[in-house]
């Protein structure tokens, strides 16, 4: 009498059976797959920029996933061909100025919306929310006419701010103000009233209590709003393209500098890649320094005690 041997289970079948018995394996596998996918899709563009920057210009047309040649001189040549350091300075200066203005004004607005009771508060918040939904392109025509001196009120023409930092800082401040106000309103509203009352008893005014008590206790929210504003302004190009002529001495930002490596007859892709890598360093350093504040700010801002 012969017995048929049952076929042995394959590795996939055994893994499925073990997963059914222990669901944590499935969750762990899903986590690893998602993490690997996120890491690859996030880091690959930076790797490709590095390959472009290190590949000699003559070999870029035949390049693959690894550099064909090794030419670190691109990181030096990029400063020799254009004053890229000036473009970086322009972006950093405009981003810092906008961030300070947005945080200063947004702090007062956040304090008013988060800690004061007044008629029409909800309506004003909804109005801010509605304004933030407008695309930036909707404001470009009136802003361009205003900043080029083509608007006249009672015979007085608007100032000509074309190719000046004011033409960039002003729209950026208005564009990123609503998000900052919403973040700070949430954080300021969570501070116990007793802490502010104690400062008021000691003789502090409302403004003094805001800067001495409310803002220090809301440091994660302030840092989050500041970093998000800085990064957004640093990377912005739409308004900069229309409000400047692309010259470094006229406050053109970093994206203008990268695009200027593309000439009429030739594009220096290796220099564009090198400039992109150098240009992202200030933002990367800022995020590394403030990452704990950003994470705590983004998570704590969604919770209420």
Task: Show the residue positions of the predicted features.
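Short glycine/proline-rich turn/loop motifs
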Residues: 14-18
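Conserved catalytic/binding loops enriched for acidic/polar residues
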Residues: 21, 25
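A structural signal for multi-pass alpha-helical bundles of membrane permease subunits
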Residues: 2-13, 28-305
């Amino acid at each position: 009498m012969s017995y048929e041997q049952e076929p042995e289970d394959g590795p996939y079948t055994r893994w499925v059976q073990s997963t059914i018995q222990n669901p944590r394996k499935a969750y762990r596998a899903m986590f690893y797959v998602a993490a690997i996918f996120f890491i690859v899709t996030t880091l690959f563009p930076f790797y490709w920029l590095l390959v472009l920057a290190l590949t000699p210009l003559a070999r870029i047309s035949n390049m693959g996933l690894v550099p064909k040649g090794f030419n670190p001189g691109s990181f030096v040549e990029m400063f020799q061909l254009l004053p890229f350091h000036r473009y970086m300075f322009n972006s950093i200066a405009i981003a810092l100025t906008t961030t300070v203005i947005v945080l200063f004004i947004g702090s007062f607005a956040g304090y008013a919306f988060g800690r004061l009771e007044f008629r029409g508060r909800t309506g004003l918040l909804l109005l801010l929310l509605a304004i933030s939904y407008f695309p930036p392109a909707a404001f470009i025509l009136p802003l361009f006419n205003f900043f080029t001196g083509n608007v006249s009120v009672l015979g007085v023409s608007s100032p000509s701010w074309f190719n000046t930092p004011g033409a960039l800082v002003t729209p950026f401040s208005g564009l990123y103000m609503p998000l900052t106000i919403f973040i700070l309103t949430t954080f300021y509203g969570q501070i116990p009233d007793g802490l502010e009352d104690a400062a008021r008893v000691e003789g502090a005014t409302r403004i003094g209590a805001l800067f001495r008590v409310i803002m220090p206790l809301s440091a994660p929210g302030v840092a989050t709003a500041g970093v998000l504003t800085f990064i957004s302004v640093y990377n912005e190009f739409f308004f900069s393209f229309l409000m400047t002529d692309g010259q470094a001495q006229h406050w053109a930002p970093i994206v203008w500098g990268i695009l200027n490596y593309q000439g009429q007859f030739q594009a220096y892709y290796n220099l564009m890649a090198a400039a992109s890598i150098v240009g992202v360093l200030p933002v990367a350093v800022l995020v590394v320094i403030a990452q704990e504040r950003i994470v705590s700010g983004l998570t704590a801002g969604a919770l209420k005690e």
